[in-house]
């Protein structure tokens, strides 16, 4: 059972266990040990980060751990998570490490790993890494003299990723004449994203491009779509694009400032790909959090949807297993597997813009392909993770709501993979009604296991 790794690597408040320099160094050593094959060549691991203040100390600790095991390090500096995955693959490195807590506030940080092919590590390798942290096995294998590793800085990493992103956009199209509001959330994409859209011909109004180490995701980025919504109306832009701290997710808004979430972007792109015979097996992979409106939209055009557990890694695993090429989450993690190995906010925005260009339609019109069912999400902070159906009053309330909804909606209750939260999600035809039911369940949960 993994204790350290959550659904997206190791995460926590920087400088408090487990997100300490000591743990980072041990993780570096364990990763180097695992990825070092028996061949005699030099081994290399890529390390990138977002713009958090604590990224510097964790980066240094990881470098020390990796080099102490005789593996070299390639430092790419602040770069989107998908960019680090891409460079890990293109530079033929043995693994990649991302120092980021994604959409969390600046005081948090995280460490996650990619294997040499650019995909996130499977659970069993994370478990192996965890077991090695306190193992004496590593101690006996420390190299000396010329065998220790060294660190190199890759100065053109951002430029390489910009070229990769531009090459993912159809060569017969451009963005000339489009006005784009772009909010980088003071995160990892602050240099890369504006350059990509500008070089493809768009007029870019950049927001959240002045990181100072403490302002990442602070009232900006994909968790605050109201920022791009207001700016789009103010500047009369064609689209607003908001990225999170490590730019692996994207939320957009149309020319009227209305939010278009991950489900709607998937509906637009999937229906376009079906029309062009590009969607493999006419199948989209989404998670259980996706709105039922997405299922309906896909069925209308002869497509189907497969649902996985929450977490983009599970979406990618299902896509690879079934040979599918489009998947994602409502939160804006969108995976175009023909182009990249993980969720990529900038790449997803480019694919959406390509549909707008190809169809010569505004985003508001394209978004009509999906009519979302009213959905309510209530988060409750909890002191313990108890199976919710073993708490009698909560279980009775949930079953009662499910009976009332019948086939016209659903109840989904799950714990967050990264925070002490229970997420209560209801879907149904009447928003007022389901909001009341969601709050009733939330109140019962607070009484039983809520944070004191």
Swiss-Prot record:
It comes from the Bacteria. Its EC number is 5.4.2.10. It is an enzyme of class 5 (isomerase). Binds 1 Mg(2+) ion per subunit. The keyword Protein transport does not apply. It holds the Pfam family PGM_PMM_IV. One of its GO terms (biological process) is UDP-N-acetylglucosamine biosynthetic process. It catalyses: alpha-D-glucosamine 1-phosphate = D-glucosamine 6-phosphate. InterPro entries: A-D-PHexomutase_a/b/a-I, A-D-PHexomutase_a/b/a-I/II/III, A-D-PHexomutase_a/b/a-II, A-D-PHexomutase_a/b/a-III, A-D-PHexomutase_C, A-D-PHexomutase_C_sf, A-D-PHexomutase_CS, Alpha-D-phosphohexomutase_SF. Gene3D superfamilies: Alpha-D-Glucose-1,6-Bisphosphate, subunit A, domain 3, Alpha-D-phosphohexomutase, C-terminal domain. GO terms for cellular component: cytosol. Mg(2+) binds at residues 102, 244, 246, 248. PROSITE patterns: PGM_PMM. Activated by phosphorylation. Its cofactor is Mg(2+). HAMAP family: GlmM_B. Catalyzes the conversion of glucosamine-6-phosphate to glucosamine-1-phosphate. Belongs to the phosphohexose mutase family. NCBIfam families: glmM (TIGR01455), PRK10887.1 (NF008139). This is Phosphoglucosamine mutase. It comes from Trichlorobacter lovleyi (strain ATCC BAA-1151 / DSM 17278 / SZ). The gene is glmM.
């Amino acid at each position: 059972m993994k204790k350290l790794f959550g659904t997206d690597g190791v995460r926590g408040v920087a400088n408090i266990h487990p997100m300490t320099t000591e743990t980072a160094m041990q993780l570096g050593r364990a990763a180097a040990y695992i990825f070092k094959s028996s061949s005699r060549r030099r081994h290399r691991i890529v390390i990138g980060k977002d713009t958090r203040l604590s990224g510097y100390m964790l980066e240094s600790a990881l470098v020390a751990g990796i080099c102490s095991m005789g593996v070299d390090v390639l430092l790419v500096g602040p770069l989107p998570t998908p960019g680090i995955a891409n460079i890990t693959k293109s530079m033929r490195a043995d693994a990649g490490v991302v120092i980021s807590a994604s959409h969390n506030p600046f005081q948090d940080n995280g460490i996650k790993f990619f294997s040499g092919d650019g995909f996130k590590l499977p659970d069993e390798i994370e478990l192996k890494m965890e077991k090695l942290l306190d193992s004496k096995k590593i101690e006996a294998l420390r190299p000396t003299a010329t065998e220790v590793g060294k660190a190199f800085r890759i100065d053109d990493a951002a430029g390489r990723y910009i070229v990769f992103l531009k090459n993912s956009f159809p060569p017969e199209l451009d963005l000339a004449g489009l006005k784009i509001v772009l909010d980088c959330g003071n995160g990892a994409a602050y240099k890369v994203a504006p350059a990509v859209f500008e070089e493809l011909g768009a007029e870019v109004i950049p927001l959240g491009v002045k990181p100072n180490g403490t302002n990442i995701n602070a009232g900006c980025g994909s968790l605050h779509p109201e920022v791009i919504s207001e700016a789009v109306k103010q500047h009369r832009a064609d689209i607003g694009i908001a990225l999170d701290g490590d730019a692996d997710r994207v939320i957009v808004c149309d020319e009227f400032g209305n939010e278009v979430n991950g489900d709607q972007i998937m509906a637009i792109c999937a229906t376009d790909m079906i029309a062009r015979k590009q969607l493999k097996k006419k199948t989209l992979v989404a998670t259980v959090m996706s709105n039922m409106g997405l299922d309906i939209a896909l069925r209308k055009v002869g497509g189907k949807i497969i649902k996985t557990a929450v977490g983009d890694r599970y979406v990618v695993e299902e896509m690879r297993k079934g040979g599918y090429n489009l998947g994602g989450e409502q939160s804006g993690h969108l995976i175009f597997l023909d182009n990249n190995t993980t969720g990529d906010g900038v790449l997803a925005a480019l694919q959406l813009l390509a549909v707008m260009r190809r169809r010569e339609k505004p985003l508001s019109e394209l978004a009509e392909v999906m009519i979302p069912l009213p959905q309510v999400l209530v988060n409750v902070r909890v002191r313990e993770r108890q199976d919710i159906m073993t708490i009698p009053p909560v279980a009775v309330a949930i079953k009662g709501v499910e009976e009332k909804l019948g086939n016209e909606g659903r109840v989904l209750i799950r714990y967050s993979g990264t925070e002490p939260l229970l997420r209560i999600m209801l879907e149904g035809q009447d928003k007022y009604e389901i909001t009341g039911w969601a709050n009733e369940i939330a109140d019962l949960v607070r009484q039983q296991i809520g944070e004191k």
